[in-house]
Amino acid sequence: MGMSKSLSCFGYPLSIFFIVVNEFCERFSYYGMRALLILYFRNFIGWDDNLSTVIYHTFVALCYLTPILGALIADAWLGKFKTIVWLSIVYTIGQAVTSLSSVNELTDNNHDGTPDSLPVHVAVCMIGLLLIALGTGGIKPCVSAFGGDQFEEGQEKQRNRFFSIFYLAINAGSLLSTIITPMVRVQQCGIHVKQACYPLAFGIPAILMAVSLIVFIIGSGMYKKFKPQGNILSKVVKCICFAIKNRFRHRSKQFPKRAHWLDWAKEKYDERLIAQIKMVTRVLFLYIPLPMFWALFDQQGSRWTLQATTMSGRIGILEIQPDQMQTVNTILIIILVPIMDAVVYPLIAKCGLNFTSLKKMTIGMFLASMAFVAAAILQVEIDKTLPVFPKANEVQIKVLNVGSENMIISLPGQTVTLNQMSQTNEFMTFNEDTLTSINITSGSQVTMITPSLEAGQRHTLLVWAPNNYRVVNDGLTQKSDKGENGIRFVNTYSQPINVTMSGKVYEHIASYNASEYQFFTSGVKGFTVSSAGISEQCRRDFESPYLEFGSAYTYLITSQATGCPQVTEFEDIPPNTMNMAWQIPQYFLITSGEVVFSITGLEFSYSQAPSNMKSVLQAGWLLTVAVGNIIVLIVAGAGQINKQWAEYILFAALLLVVCVIFAIMARFYTYVNPAEIEAQFEEDEKKKNPEKNDLYPSLAPVSQTQM
């Protein structure tokens, strides 16, 4: 039969500890791999940001659509235990294949460090990701439900606590993996050419998935395993279709109404199946509003991360990168879950308040809505600090005097005086049809120029004499979306120069011309200037000042009297000033909402599902996550909202409306005990059929010898 009651630890079945460790390792594997995907697509395979993002979100969506398939396999064919084992094997193979796809030497026959056939790597990677999506999605609804199966009747408190521990394991694995795997990626490895170590970074998640599988199998002898119930989904669909058809045939008033529309299936299906379907449909009906929560929650990895790129990551002695702010969510979960279970919920119970599962979920949705209100308020404050970029019908220009004389620059409506080696304080904005000419005056010499300026762009006018100038299109229309710093160089030597800065090369910068911007993370960056016109005795190595977040600078390279280079820095875009720590309140609100919404949702889905449909209902719960991501694409894409704070308010308002609707729906929901209902049906069947000990033997645990 099942596990002995003596095999317990601290009042919990010993088997669940294997399940929790299994989940920790699996989540480490999944999130560690997922943290690398975008950079792998862009830097290794060479896709642009848009295609990389599309493939990434397609993969994530697939991971949340395949749980339906996993639930069907578990409930109709293999059972939860075997489904977890076999799909974990598929999962492990997928991780290994993905790691293989990142090995340069797979097609690098000439050993130059670049794959000779990228399509081969793409094909291998896609096969690996498909296997991972099938594996991780397939086991998602089974593991939590299988853990719930291990508890005896009367252990509801321990089972509820298990779902909290289970969720804690998920986030602990996620936190460690998102810290460790990026650290491994930046290491250098390779057989012939040393470069970013994607094979090992993907390989560690593959190893953890293998460990997850081994740990799960070790606990096999302790698990309670239930026989699969047959193709239950097919029965459910047929029963529902028959009920609808039968009701439609008997729609005239001469036929008496029945208590529930599913009761119209009684002519063909037994009452026990109908009662089970009623339980499932009532819960699925409650699921309808839930995707809106995930629509907001999953924007931590997109909109909130982009918001962080416009902020400063200096927090005391720490320096936080924009994408690392997501770890705040995981850290807060690890802190809040024990506090909620050990302090908050017991206090609420002592106060005599009936804090039901659906009430908790309603509170969670409200907190998530308030998190986006906080994000909107923060965005308004951030917008006040951001530079103004030109609109589609505008041009912006600043003047940089790289000559040896003072100059007066006359533009429509304003005149500025520039000393040698200086620039205007800020970019000046004009309608594209008003800036038709500029006067440059030096002493008694006046030159009128008619620059060609591109609408919607920033430009720099390099001037070194009234009749010697160059207009440079800056190419910056926004701050870096990664919080990086843009650096360009202007050469005033008569010969071209080359600059190497932190491994990036600015090649052949022409005389009195500017390079393109290249982008760097925060910190002090060293650079080397080289040219045929610079003597070997000259100093060539320089260091930048400390680069903060989101800035842009022009480094002017001029010749001293000795002919040696001299560097002058000019600020093009100021660094971010709002600190990322201001995001913590919104992360606290969204995480608090997640703790009372998501953990409770898992617990509620299990407790209200009949014994033969628990995995299906868990899959339905996970499906709401996929639908939530689709909502983000629809609202964000169709809304065309220019102000980000307004989009945050829109999402907050939508969830608030959905929260009210859900509260009303929850008000009319009646909690049931599926085990009691099924036991009553069993008792009734035994009375009707005394010769049969058990009409539904599938409800009994299976002997280990049968597995």
From Swiss-Prot:
Keyword terms: Cell membrane, Glycoprotein, Membrane, Peptide transport, Protein transport, Symport, Transmembrane, Transmembrane helix, Transport
InterPro entries: MFS_trans_sf, Oligopep_transport, POT_fam, PTR2_symporter_CS
Expression (tissue specificity): Intestine, kidney, liver and low in brain.
Gene Ontology CC terms: apical plasma membrane; membrane
Subcellular location(s) of the protein: Apical cell membrane
Molecular function in Gene Ontology: dipeptide transmembrane transporter activity; peptide:proton symporter activity; tripeptide transmembrane transporter activity
PROSITE patterns, sorted: PTR2_1, PTR2_2
Region (Extracellular domain (ECD)): 383-583
UniProt feature, compositional bias: Basic and acidic residues: 684-694
Protein name: Solute carrier family 15 member 1
